[in-house]
Amino acid sequence: MAKVLTIPKNWSASDIPDLTGKRFLITGATSGIGLAAATELARRNAHVYITARTVEKARDAIKKIGPGLVDYLLMDLTDLDSVRKAAARVDKQFDVVVLNAGVMATPFTKTKDGFELQLGTNHLGHFAFAGLIKDQIKDRLVVVSSFAHKMGSFGDNNQNTIKDMLLGVGKYQKWQVYGASKLANLLFVSELERLRIVNNWSFVPIAVHPGYSDTNLQAVASQMRGAKTEEKITMAINKLLAQPASAGALPTLAACVYPGLLGASFIGPDGFMQMRGNPKLTRAKALAYDQVLAKNLWQVSEELTKVSWS
């Protein structure tokens, strides 16, 4: 298959082909971008698996998705025991796996394994899950990042500093940590592409970001603090300024199905400041391609999760 360096302008969900016989797994597809992507794939006759933390959330999402072949897998990314149990239940090959679930700008909290919540959920939980099921991924591993990665850093980039951040040591700044978690997604894709070539793994890693999209992600932090007024204001601003989740899902959908994409491609919206629009190939900030930082993050992630990709 010819490799492509561009996605046609105005590519949309209507360009998705029939996906009969294809299997997709999407984490965090009970709302927002993940739910929108799952809905479109199911409409094209794909067999879609979604992950959810509870049976109730899974069944509610499947009802929203509507007609189609949809199953669920219970998994809590904040609990590595749950991640391992979910991975052990993955006994089928998936054409595409989408690492989509996430939290944003939450109050300081730790996961069951002692990781800072945002980095533990957005990066470490996914790192572990994907590593445990890598032999079941056929074609693509899609990782949902954010343009907020531009706010992220890992200090002096050495392993001790990275480990401290992942463990929530030091001053907590919720937006900077969210940015670091989204930068971690991109560093993960960069290092995974290098390792894919070395190990001759069959699947291609691709990163995406949804721009500014109307999902409940922005309101979760307010909900955790019990700040009802702030939550209402956030949701009102989203309705006014953000693109709908169905539009925000387009980069993810393109990464899932558009043929010939290169490993470590990064796809986002083509509009002003990449906040909205149709999908296009783009570039992250330079730090996202720092090979030393990517290797250091990878090694620390393997150490903390006790999941080895080799």
Positions of PLM-derived features:
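Short glycine-enriched, charge-decorated loop/helix-capping segments at active-site entrances
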Residues: 113-115, 282-287
